[in-house]
Regions:
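Intrinsically disordered, low-complexity regulatory regions
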Residues: 1-113
Length: 113
């Protein structure tokens, strides 16, 4: 006989499975951004192309150059990549079509000049 109470949690989200040490690294990216820009600046919206470019810079630094941490922020490059992926997911969930400037087969990327 168990002294533990009954809990019907089958099918519920398992937050306990997330690697918290890496979530903390992602939180450091958000914290750095809140100081460099302002809190919640990313929620104002960044174009998909700018997010993609930043994601690729961090991915390139980690993948091809073997760097682990960004020199400016001190944040792990993969945490920065995760930040931009979360931006994409948030903007898509929020229906921010105004930010979606992905190129298509018939329309090349636009210049940011």
């Amino acid at each position: 006989m168990s002294n533990e109470g009954e809990k019907f949690d089958t099918g519920k989200v398992r937050w306990d499975l997330l690697p918290m040490v890496w979530l903390e690294e992602v939180a450091k990216v958000y914290s750095f951004g809140s100081v460099k820009y302002e809190s919640w600046n990313w929620r104002k919206g960044l174009s998909f192309s700018r997010c993609a470019a930043a994601f690729m810079r961090h991915w390139f630094a980690w993948w091809w150059r073997g760097e682990t941490h960004d020199q400016e922020s001190g944040c792990h490059h993969l945490a920065s990549c995760t930040f931009y992926l979360l931006n994409f997911m948030t903007y898509q969930k929020d229906g921010r079509k105004d930010l979606d400037d992905r190129p298509t087969a018939t329309q090349p990327p636009q210049s940011r000049a």
